[in-house]
């Protein structure tokens, strides 16, 4: 299970490096919607916010970023 988490976090880091988050998303906490089943990071502490939010009625594959 730990290996899956590490792989998921590495994937997120790759995405973050290749895609800048617009300032308004940081400022107002607005995040893009993710596709059903897509992994979305859940805010844990002040370090990093959600990468995407789940549309209503769908379940996302979420994990915590510490």
Swiss-Prot record:
GO molecular function, one term: neuropeptide hormone activity
SS bond list: 34-52, 40-60
A Pfam family it matches: CART
Keyword Disulfide bond: yes
Keywords: Cleavage on pair of basic residues, Disulfide bond, Neuropeptide, Neurotransmitter, Secreted
InterPro entries, alphabetized: CART, CART_C_sf
One of the GO BP terms on file: positive regulation of blood pressure
SUPFAM superfamilies: Satiety factor CART (cocaine and amphetamine regulated transcript)
Location of the protein in the cell: Secreted
Top-level lineage group: Eukaryota
Function: Satiety factor closely associated with the actions of leptin and neuropeptide y; this anorectic peptide inhibits both normal and starvation-induced feeding and completely blocks the feeding response induced by neuropeptide Y and regulated by leptin in the hypothalamus.
Family: Belongs to the CART family.
Protein name, per record: Cocaine- and amphetamine-regulated transcript protein
Organism: Sus scrofa (Pig)
